[in-house]
Amino acid sequence: MSRHVALILLVSAGLLAPGTLASPQPVPKGHLVVVGGGGVPDVILKRAIELAGGPAAPIVVFPQASELADTGDVAVDMWRNAGATNVKWLPLTDAAAARQAVESAAFIWFPGGDQSKLMKAFEGTGVPEVISRRYRDGAVVGGTSAGAAVMSAIMLTGDADLQSITVGATKTAAGLGLWPEVIVDQHHLKRQRQSRLISLVLEHPTIVGVGIDERTAAIVSGPRFEIIGESSVLVIDARRAKIEPRAPGARAAARDITLHVLTAGMGMEIKN
């Protein structure tokens, strides 16, 4: 098991919080484009292409989160229609070829679907390690819906109680860990997912919850992110909250949780 994957699993298990590693982690030179699903507006597409280096920047797409056979082609068409001229989607049947393509990519993109399915497809390929290194070295990594959820180290799986704020009701798995300071939720307002993100933040109070609504993106550059798009992003911060100890299955309770509601043009910095 690689050190990268081992650290993600420790974070997911609650045994190691981001910011507590033995040696300081360098600030990534790249950017994340984290979209809440529901379509990707032109303003987000254009910004992503700009961050990647312009229309000729090489873009690779991993569509394995989706069960639809044409997801890769649809994503390629989306980026071409936005002005990109060098874009292709990658199968994982040849892991070495996929790793090589990522090595030369300026932008890596994940369409929607099921985030657990994508992470399962990556197992044993070595591709996540290359993506992580490319992000640290300056590449742009983006995704929408399920492709946004995988940015976290502690990744929402979709298995949750949306009707209550209950200890242990929101299930997680290990994500790519590209944005380990936060837990990303997607379709956040449109699908009324606030309860599951609050539940998870109270269980992992050292990590900030970022709920991104549809047709909206967080553009992450180092510790800072900014909002572009059409709707809102909710930031739920329990790092200084007074959390009541409760057993699994009980109603979660806390005081002094900080809530930020951000829209296009706004941003903030998250530091541990």
Identify the residue ranges that each predicted region occupies:
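Positively charged n-region of N-terminal signal peptides that target proteins for export
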Residues: 1-4
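Bacterial N-terminal signal peptides
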Residues: 6-18
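Class I SAM-dependent methyltransferase SAM-binding "motif I" and its flanking Rossmann-like core
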Residues: 21, 99, 111, 117-194
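C-terminal and late-domain segments of enzyme folds
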Residues: 23-55, 66-74, 79-81, 156-157, ...
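Short internal beta-strands
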Residues: 58-64
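Portal/gating segments that form or line small-molecule/metal binding sites
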Residues: 66-107, 112, 117
